[in-house]
Amino acid sequence: MTATLPAGLPAILPGHGLAGQVALVTGASRGLGRVIADALAGAGAAVGLVARSAGPLAQTADQLTAGGATAVAVTADVTDPRAVAAAVEQVSRRLGPIDVLINNAGAAGPYGALWEVDPGDWWQAIEANLRGTVACTQLVLPSMIARRHGRIVNITSQAGAYRWPLVSAYAVAKAAEIKLTENLAAELRHTGVTIFSAHPGLLPIGLSEQALTSRAPEDPATAKVFSWIRRELEQGHGADPDVAARFVLRLAAGDCDRLSGRHLTVHDNLDTLIAQADEISRHDLYTLRRAEL
């Protein structure tokens, strides 16, 4: 049902661990965010956890500390700039300056054709996916740049690189995040800070979980989207959450810095891409571009 581990993914190169570093993960109360937080803690990082749901977020923190990790949980809505600023300040004060930011918080948004969905719901999904990423990134960058050290991983989606009919808000937001990653990489060149767009694959947790566990929805658009998700996972086109977390961990750990600004996926062989980094840069690959004749 799930993809196997791609070659070149699991190992972090010597000297590129996260011991002594501070990582901040948004959307850390459940799903992929929780799995990523656990992977970061396992690599030696102290982890700041941010999410809206206080109860599940506390469970994530308890899980990490029970394993011997250092973790701080802060309840905050990433679409609220003041709440984000307070969360970043609290994590930095208690754990130290943030070295790694994982922008994972997001929402699928309304399902349906654009002219049929509620405009407010559509824009709310854009904010949940994009505004939080921008707010968190803006807040951690000054310290990273001053220290000439930092890595940011934006959890995006192939929906932003291609299309996802009936899920336009999510696809548009993810496309914006992919382009934000590319633009920031150019702005951050020579600062010591790198940034990546990371597609974790279609997972059986998080945004897909409702499709797997809910009864058949009455809304035709939602039913169609859920049916597609179930079919893709049943046909083995998904990814394992632990594999996805190790993919993100490798980007955060430093040995992929030559790929800064690129849109990468869990199915990529990172060792091969690192070896081809000069060619990738020369031909401007792994970015969003218009295909021409």
Segments the model singles out, each with a brief description of its role:
Residues 3, 197, 219-293:
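C-terminal helical subdomain
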Residues 22, 29-30:
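Conserved glycine-rich cofactor-binding loop
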Residues 137, 173-176:
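Active-site helix of classical SDR
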Residues 137-138, 182:
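A short, exposed helix-loop element centered on a Lys and neighboring polar residues
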